[in-house]
Amino acid sequence: MFRFRRTLLVTAALAVLGVGQVFWGQQDDSSYWNKVYSTGQTIFVHHPTELLVNAIKGRRPGAALDIGMGQGRNSIFLAQQGWEVTGFDPSEEGVRQARERAAKLGLHLRALVVGEEDFDLGTAQWDLIVMTYVRRIRPEDAGRFARALRPNGIFVYENNNAGKQNELLKYFLAWRILHFEDVDTSSDWHPERTLRVERLVAEKPPAE
């Protein structure tokens, strides 16, 4: 069981990568991310987010969706744990690298080159939806993800937050909150930098 906590924080920051500045929410710019992923530098880590690792402990593997999968670090981890994984990203290069890594590891991974606006989440199709460092949550997202998840399915979210403190919570009032943070902390892929980060693990209520 995760802790539920609300933490006051002070600042937000921009992450600076080897090819320039990244403004979160820019994931739909495929040409930009193709350039980032094509540098040959190890810009992003390949291990999964700690939040996701903890979120699936004790859960039976099922169908998982990784929104904005990038190079596939979370998708590949889930596939290694026995989940049936679909991931998508608008970056052809990111998806290519994810497919390549999965193949080398002998893993089955459905990796698609598509933007979020063109991907049909479906209805009661997923046991897990993951969205890390893609964009900020919008008010209508909670309903969309609830429809797409099966009963007791979970949504795992992590991103920089430049909005109001704890605003994310009001979008998920009907959900069971397993973990929440809105903190000034280090990113898991840039531990030397302090960023304002929000993390959420929420479970869809069982069908009545």
Regions found by a protein language model. Name each.
Residues A98-R99:
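Conserved SAM-binding loop
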Residues F119-L128:
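A short acidic, Gly/Pro-enriched loop at the edge of an enzyme's catalytic core
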